[in-house]
């Protein structure tokens, strides 16, 4: 079985521009720093709240749901695992589209379910037909690693096609123009999954959550690990949620840099699929040279993400960093252009 392979993590002090894991380039809210300063180390001998009630209440108030409609986990990876563990027994069907987050396929393999893989291709405008008899379907919106996003109305059409649970993986929703939260109110089979890793600059804290109908969230609570969110994580995320001003400012900066960098790259002749996430899928003019492009960037101390998968071998996924980081990347793209021009 092929497992999930994360992006390369350089050692401390290594002089790379790290743009391969879709981390937020800005620090967390100052309120997080204050919580860390005030945390009593003696408290770490105690187990955390097993149901993360304060977090769920804060998230519910922020997003317009009750705490009973929310479950928290050790990152959205944990939430995705809980979903498969809860709703798809061995031999039943888990559906997803590719290209997409590789963990979907891995989770299906681990739990012995049948992976039903639907292929989508550029320009990614036409949604796939969803089989009626699936137990569970994962749809990443915005898509990773490509970055395109569907409007809520189009996602609703897809969700209505299946009798199973339709999961909208919104790991990058805060960077997009639209999200699918309204579908949780309107459709009984929709669950939305989110994370604080990207938007709140808390990838190291590991907190993901699902929002859905109470009856489905209650089932998920039955299969989650007993203490799956640490005391420290619950404290720092609660603090970050109180600081929406920092969130909005950083999201705005990333979106602005994304737009500028996309325009400049395209003007050089690089191909970019319009992105609604905190990354872009960047392709040199010459097709089929994604791995060489990745290696050329790596040699110049720029870490991107290459996927040796169908539909992804023409380019790399590149996180949007700070403006000065992306200016350096743009300079490298200019230097590399003669090597990757179409024949």
Language model regions located:
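N-terminal "arm"/small-domain region of PLP-dependent enzymes with the aminotransferase-like
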Residues: 1-46, 132-133
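PLP-dependent aminotransferase class I/II
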Residues: 51, 189-266, 270-273
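Phosphate-binding glycine-rich loop
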Residues: 53-93, 111
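A short linear hydrophobic-aromatic micro-motif
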Residues: 68, 192, 268-271, 302-307
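PLP-dependent aminotransferase-like
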Residues: 86-140
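Active-site phosphate-binding strand-loop segment of PLP-dependent enzymes
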Residues: 116-174
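PLP-dependent enzyme catalytic core of the Aspartate aminotransferase-like
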Residues: 153, 296-300, 305, 309-343
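Conserved PLP-binding catalytic core of the aspartate aminotransferase-like
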Residues: 255, 267-300, 316
């Amino acid at each position: 079985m092929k497992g999930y392979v994360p992006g390369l993590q350089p050692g401390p002090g290594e002089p790379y521009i790290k743009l391969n894991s879709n981390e937020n380039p800005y620090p967390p809210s100052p309120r997080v720093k204050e919580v860390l300063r005030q945390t009593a180390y003696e408290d770490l001998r105690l187990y955390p709240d097993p149901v993360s009630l304060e977090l769920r209440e804060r998230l519910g108030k922020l997003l317009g749901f009750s705490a009973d409609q929310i479950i928290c986990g050790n990152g959205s990876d944990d939430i995705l695992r809980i979903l498969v563990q809860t709703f798809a027994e061995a031999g039943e069907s888990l559906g997803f589209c590719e290209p997409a987050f590789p963990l979907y396929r891995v989770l299906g393999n681990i739990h012995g379910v049948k992976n039903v893989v639907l292929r989508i291709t550029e320009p990614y405008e036409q949604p796939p037909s969803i089989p009626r008899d699936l137990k569970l379907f994962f749809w990443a919106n915005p898509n990773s690693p490509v970055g395109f996003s569907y409007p809520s109305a189009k996602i609703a059409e897809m969700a209505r096609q299946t009798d199973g649970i339709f999961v909208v993986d919104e790991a990058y929703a805060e960077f997009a123009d639209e999200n699918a939260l309204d579908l949780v109110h309107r459709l009984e089979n929709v669950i939305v999954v989110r994370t604080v890793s990207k938007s709140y600059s808390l990838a190291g804290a590991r907190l993901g959550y699902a929002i859905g109908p109470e009856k489905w969230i209650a089932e998920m609570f039955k299969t989650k690990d007993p203490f799956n969110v640490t005391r420290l994580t619950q404290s720092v995320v609660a603090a970050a949620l109180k600081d929406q001003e920092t969130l909005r400012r950083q999201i705005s900066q990333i979106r602005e840099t994304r737009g500028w960098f996309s325009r400049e790259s395209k003007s050089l002749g690089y191909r970019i699929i319009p992105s609604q996430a905190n990354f872009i899928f960047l392709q040199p003019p010459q097709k089929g040279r994604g791995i060489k492009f990745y290696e050329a960037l790596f040699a110049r101390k720029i870490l991107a993400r290459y996927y040796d998968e169908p539909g992804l071998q023409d380019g790399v996924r590149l996180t949007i960093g700070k403006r000065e980081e992306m200016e350096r990347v743009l300079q490298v793209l200019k230097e590399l252009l003669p090597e990757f021009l179409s024949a």
